[in-house]
Amino acid sequence: VNTKDQDEKKAIATFLWMFSSVMIMIERLPASMLSNFAAHVFNSECGIYMDHYEHPTVEQTLRLQVAFYMMSSMTEFAFRDIKNVGSNDEQEKGTQRAFSNMSLMKGLNLSGTLVVEGFSLIYNCMAYICEQKHDIKDMMFYNKQHEYATCEAWRLNPDDFETARRYAAAVDETGRRFYTVVGNFKEAVLCFEKANEMFVELFKQEKHSTILNDMLLSSYNIINILNAEHLYDLLCMKAEETLALVTDRMDDPDTDLGLVAAICESKGHALMMLKQFDEAWVWLNKAQKVYEDNLNKNPEDEKCMRDLAIIKCRIADYLMAKGSDADNIIAIVNEAEGLLKKALDIVPDSPKVAKNYIGLLSTKMKVYLLKRDINAADETLAQFEKLTLKHILNTRDTSLIQLMFAVYDSFIDTAVQSDWTQMANALLQVKQNAEKQLVENRLMKG
C-alpha cells in the first residue's frame, strides 16, 4: 500500500502482524504462503523504520527485528517442505529474497539475538541449496556462517535453553556435512561428539521431547561413524546407552520413533557383523516394524519409503550372511527396489534416494555373485555404474567416489568368497578402469 501518512503506515503494519499471527495458527496452510506473507510484514516494518532512520523509536527497532526473525523463520519453515528434491527454483527464490533482507539488516547495524538467529536460519538454507548443487566450497562457507551465527546468538543470550540447543544442532549439522558430503571423518567425529555432549547436558536440565530427538540424532550420527570404522562393539554400547534414555518415552507422541528405529537397525547390523545372528534378527525386526507403521500412517512420504527400503536391504544382508535361499533374498531386495522407485517418482532429483539406490544395487549384486548369475550380475553392475561412475563423469560431482570404490571392493570380496575367481578378476579390472577414467578427467589424483 502506497501511503506517506505515518499513522496509516503503522495501522497497516499492525494489521499485518495480527493477520500473520492468525495465519501461523492455521493448520495445513502452505508454508510458502506463510513465507511470502512474512516477507510482506518485514517490508512494511522496514518502510516505517527507514522513514525514521536517523532517530527510530525503540518500538520501531524492536518491531523490525521481530519481523526479520519471523521472515527468516518462515523462509526456513517453507524450505523444510521442499528439502531433498535437488535444486529447486522456489526454494532459491525465497532464500535469495531472505538473503537480500539479511544484507539490509547488516547495513542497519541491527545485531540483537533475534536478528543473529535470523541470520543463522538463512545461512543454513543457503548451505543446503549449495549442498544440493554439489557446490562444496560455498556449502561449507555458509554452513560455518550458520554455526558462527548460532554461537553468537548463544553468547548474547547464554541462559536461554533454545538458543543453546540451536547451537548444538548447528555443530551437529556441520558434522553431518563433513561426514556425508566432504568425507572428512576426523572433523565429523569432533563435531558429533561436541554436539552430543551438549545435548546430553541440555537433556539433564530439561527432559523435553525436542532435545531428546536432537540427542537421538546426534547419537545416531556417532553410531554411523562407528559403523564406518567397523567398531561394532563400541557401536552396540553407544546404541544401548542411547536407547536406555528413551525406554520410558516410547509412547510419547513427540518422540521420533524413526530415529529410535534407525539406532535399532544399526545395532542389528553390528550384531550381525559380530556373528550374533539371533540377537541381530530381533533388533532388525524391531526397526522394520516401526518403519512399516510409519509408512502405513504416511503412505506418500518418500522418507518413510526409503527407511523401509533400507531396512529390507539390511535384512537381505542378514539372510546372505546366514546363507539363506538366494531367491528369497532377491524377493526382499525387489520389494525394497519397488519402494525406492516410488520414492523417486515423488522426488525425481533426490540425492538421498540415489544414494539409497546405490546401496540397494550393492546388496543385489552380491546376491547375484553368490548365485553366480552372470547375466543378472552384468545388468546390475551396469545400473550401478550409471548411478556412480557415469554420474560422476557427467556432473563432476566427486562426493560419490569414496562410496563407489568401497562398493567395488565389496563386489570383489564377494566374488572371491563364492570362489568365482574369473568374476573377481573382471571386477578388479572394472574398478581399475573407473580409476583410470577419473584420473584422466582430473576428478581424482593418480
Language model features with spans:
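Flexible helix-coil transition and linker loops at the boundaries of alpha-helical arrays
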Residues: N2-A11, R28-L34, Y49-A67, N84-N88, ...
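"A position-specific structural signal for the A-helix of alpha-solenoid helical repeats
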Residues: W17-S21, S44, Y69, S73-E76, ...
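Residue at a conserved register position within TPR or TPR-like alpha-solenoid repeats
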Residues: A78-D81, Y123, C130, V171, ...
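Residue-level detector of the short coil/turn that links helix A to helix B
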Residues: H134, V182-G183, H230, K275, ...
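Fold-core signature of tandem repeat domains
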Residues: Y167-A168, C191, A195-M198, M215-S218, ...
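TPR/TPR-like (Sel1-like) alpha-helical repeat modules
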Residues: A382-L389, N425-V439
